[in-house]
């Protein structure tokens, strides 16, 4: 993984799984969770194979160590060759002097189901001590804190950030600054003297007295004497959970004092920004920090999203993100965008790289406008241009409304559309997406044999039209009566262009003339979505057969790879 990176992909593609795996190895507080792993951490929930426990093994190699880390982990240092992307496994010792070689720390997690205890177990180790003949040495909590790995699952977890619960961001800061609040005894003593609702007129004390009288008929009076309501359990652990920070809300009492609310009651964006401020403090305290952050865009406007990314990158040794936001993704170089894909439990990541024909100076704009959605999807449909993009997406949505029991919409099929801008770029784009492990579809005009063959090799599902342009695909395939009605409606609504007034559609117009004048109209309106508007105007039987059959074929291909839902069994 490069110094900084963003992992992108469809939902459930494995982005969070990757971060969870690293957290199992390096998270200081992760092993305190009980159990440390469970049934669902195993592929398909299978933690036994023929009554033999299945092992979960995770290995992480950390490079770019600070001088303090090199000293602290001195006995466990190995050597990493950046050019080969591998550890140096043996002599000669002089190989460690190469410029491309640097110290590395290899760490491992091993976990499994324990048959004897009927429970799951797991532990982290310095990986080199797991070699045969060596004594395994634990990678302990103190060691993990020296690695500086911080995992923020999503900013929605901010409800604990400013509490004093163990593992909260505020607690981490206090530990790192070696601040130990000597307040618990004072607070507990104060709270012990506070009773709630003791006044008889409130009626609560009378009820508690009745409870005591009822209990005395069952157990001795010493066992349940003088019930009272207290502020908390009066333990340090419970105080950690209930104490929280209050902040000004912007509202004021009549006496001019500001009304304070628990910080979690602030706006979501404010809470998220507070969390990031705490992370910034942590980064300032530690020399080497590796941030792993999920979806930093939640509840933040685009300009704040960008600021978050730049701030975290600036303050960390390495920053890793997951995201679905184009404003986050465009902040990274093409090789820093890692596209995650998963097939039958096998997880792969490939750098997005530079899309074909896109120049570096236009990368950010093109990423946001054309490519971001397709990088996040499992399946991609390539169209030649914007008009084709609009026509096929409109037709698919129309068919979805007509057949709600099916899955015709590209959104429901998990397919992102991307336009190639020209027929010669369909094949290069297909290769670009297939390299990332995506299923690639392409709909294109009738082509010469050479271009057709290149496209067929480059994509998984090619669909070639019978005409040499999208206008002809629609005009020659649409129902003639529907086309005339649409043309007459344009005239009636005063939407027919004045320079074509002598050729305006009229009742009884021959199809050849209608075809010619409507083609001129659509050429004039190219890029305005007029052709897609015609598709929206048509009923299913009036739509071009090539378009409807292609959409149904795409639907069928998606479900042929899965268990076919009952609603679409049989022929389409």
Q: For the regions a protein language model found, what residue spans apply to each?
A:
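Conserved beta-strand position immediately N-terminal to the Walker
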Residues: 5-6, 150, 380
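Conserved catalytic network of the ASCE P-loop NTPase/AAA+ motor domain
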Residues: 10, 48-53, 98-102, 142-145, ...
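Conserved P-loop NTP-binding catalytic core
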Residues: 20-101
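Short glycine-/polar-rich loops that comprise or flank the Walker A/P-loop
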Residues: 54-58, 103-107, 145-149, 317, ...
